[in-house]
């Protein structure tokens, strides 16, 4: 019998992505905003999709976070982030000269805990960065209320949450800044890409400022003349990524619906108490379970042809960020978590197989 090979992540593509790539390739204009103008098109479509006031396409989720944090207080201070995240969530704070303050998560959701935010916040706090872990949306109402009471912005890390909703509004339309990541493993797949949506009252000013920073700080371009008024970076999205993104965005709701159906099957079928909750507002970038003897279980699943993950090693446990923090729920989750595939290429037989194998092992 042929051994199964079930991937943890796998983008779903069709002729639309191939057609768009060919259009860009044949145009010979592959840089942002040139040739077939897929970057401009993607920007407009994604802003409309999220319901945001404005938005800017960039070349990674890390770039999106960096640009967002670069526009908070120029007075150096502290930014509160969860440690249970990819390192970019913390890196972006240091890039802008601020100090990272790690907050714990709610062990029932994996999302940042508003109660712990209240404990960590101070007069030095300049922003809060909640992460929608696995696509499960944080308690934005509580976080927003905390931020407003301290007159600081919320910068959502929505790297896992393209297409997710909160109170029936899409993620991207709620906070001051919302940062997305697009990658072959993400819900909206691209070779590489990112996006910032902006919902502040001064969104027009911030959009223009970030667009300047996205291209090395260049502004006031007239013909071949331009000015540079502040530091910037080369964070443009390229036309190839945007071409794929336009095709992916047109079917994102359908792709996420498939992920939700897969997550529902895990939630109903797995004989575990500690598992990711089910809600139709989640985009389910992955599905997580918490187990003892994680490595042994992962190895058994690997031998059965099932790829799994461990999202994430806590940032405060890495050498660079090594700090004596007491973050018990984060450390418990990171020690026990196994992430399972939810991607739309999974068949019903694949899901049944994964569920059966896990139930046999546990």
Located regions from the model:
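Active-site phosphate-binding strand-loop segment of PLP-dependent enzymes
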Residues: 108-190, 195-203
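N-terminal "arm"/small-domain region of PLP-dependent enzymes with the aminotransferase-like
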Residues: 1-31, 341
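Helix C-cap/helix->beta junction micro-motif
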Residues: 96, 149-150, 304
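Hydrophobic/aromatic ligand-binding patch that stacks against planar heteroaromatic rings
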Residues: 91-93, 146, 240
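PLP-dependent aminotransferase class I/II
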Residues: 11, 40-44, 49-55, 62, ...
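Short, well-ordered alpha-helices that flank and scaffold nucleotide-derived cofactor binding pockets
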Residues: 66, 70, 74, 119, ...
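Phosphate-binding glycine-rich loop
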Residues: 32-78, 84, 92-96, 102-104, ...
